[in-house]
Amino acid sequence: MKKFLIFLIKVYRKYISPLKVPCCRFYPTCSQYVLEALQKHGIIKGGFMSIKRILRCNPFCKGGYDPVK
């Protein structure tokens, strides 16, 4: 399951992301954060961290440097 999710993120980054205007308020980008979180913490904790991060990526959040810990 983890490999499948990582595959989906890579497909998104290669084919869908280039079509959009860059708008992520964080570094690393949300898609990179998701990849790192899944690889480092697994599907449960990494998935939860990813959802929290994506919900924070909005116009009302300042953004900035937010690495996977």
From Swiss-Prot:
Subcellular location field: Cell membrane
Key words of the record: Cell membrane, Membrane
CC terms in the record's Gene Ontology section: plasma membrane
Top-level taxon of origin: Bacteria
Membrane topology according to the record: Peripheral membrane protein
The keyword Cell membrane is annotated on this UniProt entry: yes
InterPro entries: Membr_insert_effic_factor_YidD
Main localization, broad class: membrane
Family listed: Belongs to the UPF0161 family.
Function of the protein: Could be involved in insertion of integral membrane proteins into the membrane.
Protein name from the UniProt record: Putative membrane protein insertion efficiency factor
